[in-house]
């Protein structure tokens, strides 16, 4: 939701690896993040599934000024990485991010352009209670991955119990056969 710290890209990538996303994507299964916030999980999922090299869109690396740096090799590697990403983007499974907060969705959409993913991920304002597989995801079970809000204090934990129960119900009722991965500070 709004005001929460966004998930770091490396942590999002680790969550997706642990959840089995690369295998789900290879099978053609899609990804839904029903509490997407700033959209980090769907964006990392797209980069991973498209075989994009980490930091491919970055323009500067410290080694570029190193005396031993060989620009021709670096340029060739960048070209190869760009070609692999282009080929991977053509085979990208459906990836969707939903959030109840319209500001988060707007920020996620803006971020898509920054990382070269505009048009490849669908973000939309939607309450968790109405999350179902996207119409493009009917054929192959995918992955639901979410980072729900979590409480630090005991009172907050009690307030979250209904949310976590609702998550379980929603997954059982509407995502049969799908994988699910929840990242939370609560056990």
Per-segment meaning from a language model:
Residues 1-2:
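Non-catalytic substrate-recognition/targeting regions of SAM-dependent transferases
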Residues 7-10, 14-131:
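Conserved S-adenosyl-L-methionine
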Residues 28, 141, 175-179:
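Short glycine-dipeptide loop
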Residues 90-94, 98-111, 152-187:
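Conserved Class I SAM-dependent methyltransferase catalytic core
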Residues 130-145:
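A short acidic, Gly/Pro-enriched loop at the edge of an enzyme's catalytic core
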Residues 145-152:
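A short SAM/SAH-binding and catalytic strip from SAM-dependent methyltransferases
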């Amino acid at each position: 939701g709004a005001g929460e710290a966004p998930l770091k890209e490396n942590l999002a990538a680790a969550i997706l690896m642990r959840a089995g996303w690369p295998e789900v994507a290879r099978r053609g299964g899609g990804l839904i993040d029903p509490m997407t916030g700033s959209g980090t999980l769907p964006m990392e999922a797209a980069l991973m599934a498209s075989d994009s090299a980490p930091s491919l869109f970055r323009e500067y690396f410290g080694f570029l000024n190193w005396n031993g740096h060989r620009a021709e090799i670096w340029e060739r590697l960048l070209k190869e990485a760009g070609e692999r990403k282009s080929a991977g983007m053509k085979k990208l499974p459906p990836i969707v991010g939903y959030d109840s907060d319209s500001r988060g969705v707007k920020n996620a959409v803006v971020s898509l352009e920054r990382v070269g993913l505009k048009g490849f991920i669908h973000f939309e304002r939607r309450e968790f209670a109405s999350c179902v597989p996207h119409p493009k995801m009917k054929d192959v079970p995918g992955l639901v991955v979410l980072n729900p809000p979590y409480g630090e204090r005991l009172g907050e934990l009690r307030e979250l119990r209904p949310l976590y129960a609702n998550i379980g119900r929603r997954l059982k009722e509407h995502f049969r056969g799908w994988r699910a991965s929840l990242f939370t500070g609560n056990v």
